[in-house]
Amino acid sequence: MDLKNFIRNIDDFPKPGIDFKDVTTLFKDGDAFKYAVDSIVEELKDKDVDLVIGPEARGFLMGTPVAYALGVGFVPIRKPGKLPGEVESYEYGLEYGTDTLEIHKDAIKKGQKVAIVDDLLATGGTMEAAAKLVEKLGGEVVSMQFLIELKFLNGREKLSNYDVNSLIKY
């Protein structure tokens, strides 16, 4: 199945000059969504994953069905102030400024093998920050899985120390 056929391109969103890849059209097609999830699960099945992590927000949509299919737990990584209780934070640089991600301090046990799943790999900044949070808590990132990779943004280079897989490349 060619998953590119299920991605809608929206010109000039969220601002002029951006060619937005809308994954909601894939999510609403049951066969395409199942194929995407099954493809990621196939990539992960021999990696002894203990836990799947998904960054806010579309990482939740891709990560939870993958975790379910693998029979492991799912942990969200969120923007600041969205998680109750004690959190670990990681601040990272953006093109203009900084951003922060948070995870519960008790989300990962030392030595757990973690797969990070998200919808899109762009510059790699968010995924690198997610990996740093996992490692800060003692987890091992065994794979990073994406529905889409925007190759021209070179995010894979920033993640060269990790196993990276994407189903669709632009």
UniProtKB/Swiss-Prot annotation:
Q: Where in the cell does this protein reside?
A: Cytoplasm
- Top-level taxon of the source organism: Bacteria
Q: Name one GO molecular function term.
A: adenine binding
Reaction equations catalysed: AMP + diphosphate = 5-phospho-alpha-D-ribose 1-diphosphate + adenine
Top EC class per UniProt?
transferase
| InterPro entries (UniProt xref) | Ade_phspho_trans, PRibTrfase_dom, PRTase-like, UPRTase/APRTase
Where does this protein chiefly localize?
Answer: cytoplasm
Which key words tag this protein in UniProt? Cytoplasm, Glycosyltransferase, Purine salvage, Transferase
Q: In which pathway does it act?
A: Purine metabolism; AMP biosynthesis via salvage pathway; AMP from adenine: step 1/1
- EC number, as in UniProt: 2.4.2.7
SUPFAM superfamilies, alphabetized: PRTase-like
List, in alphabetical order, the GO biological process terms annotated in this UniProt record. Answer: adenine salvage; AMP salvage; purine ribonucleoside salvage
Entry's CDD domains? PRTases_typeI (cd06223)
Q: Gene Ontology terms, cellular component aspect?
A: cytoplasm
Q: What does this protein do?
A: Catalyzes a salvage reaction resulting in the formation of AMP, that is energically less costly than de novo synthesis.
| NCBIfam families tied to this protein | apt, PRK02304.1-2, PRK02304.1-3, PRK02304.1-5
HAMAP family assigned? Aden_phosphoribosyltr
Subunit field text: Homodimer.
Q: Which protein family is named in the record?
A: Belongs to the purine/pyrimidine phosphoribosyltransferase family.
Name of the protein described by the UniProt record: Adenine phosphoribosyltransferase
Species this protein is from: Clostridioides difficile (strain 630) (Peptoclostridium difficile)
